[in-house]
Amino acid sequence: MSGMNMLIVQPQWLDAIADWEQELRHAGRSKDTRYTRTYHLRRLAHDHRNHSPWDLTRHDLVEWMADHDWAPETRRSYRSSLATFYRWGHAMGHITVDPAFTLAPVKIPRARPRPAPNDVVDDALRHVDLRVRMMILILAFTGMRRGECSRLHTKQLERDLLGWQLRVIGKGGTERLIPIDDQLAATLRLLPSGWVFPGQIDGHISAHYLGKLVSRALGDGWTAHTLRHRFASLAYAVERDIRAVQELLGHASVTTTQIYTYVPEQSMRRAAAGAGVGLFAA
């Protein structure tokens, strides 16, 4: 049973969340974004079953968020969901004061990339079934987000003058092309036409479940996202072209891409040594 289905949500919350999701759909938010946002509100609803969504105060929201030991990125995502929901509720006239309007922004500390090591990936590939093996290979070879991988369809495989590529629909509905090698393309071409990973979410597997399977296969805290870090770091090491990596990952900002690309210690040592060349000869 999914986490969404285990939550107890009262009808007054369900109605409000459903109306809000329609607004998100109208605004062109992706399926993954809508799922994440509504899941956050369902968790809030589950923990406030004796209250209407329009009864909660700023203090209630702050107390609720403070009670959870979330990673900074997760905390920022929850804050964004609350802010979006209550801004909509205020605009619709459900409340006269937006309780999330003055919630403090969440500071994200600068983190080093965490690319999954080759030995971890190789070991996982030797011990998983064919479906999970395909998930890991696609994520490792393309750097796709888990949601993009979960929605992968055979019709997204294309060929141009330079070779095979995948046409990926990313965040905000933006398209990008990811070149792939002939071996992965040949494997995808052997699949029957349709979703690469069939499931119960409009015919395909959910991003959450795909991520769970990959994390379980990799072990030791490695995830689908660390495969994305791995792809970014290796791609950058080949050409040292951060803009190329940005396009491959589908980032709106190159600043985000820099967070994903691991710079080897040897490179930093060479750079530091180069800065001091000739000083002692003077």
Where in the sequence are the language-model features?
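DNA breakage-rejoining catalytic core of tyrosine-based enzymes
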Residues: 95-97, 108-123, 172-182, 192-194, ...
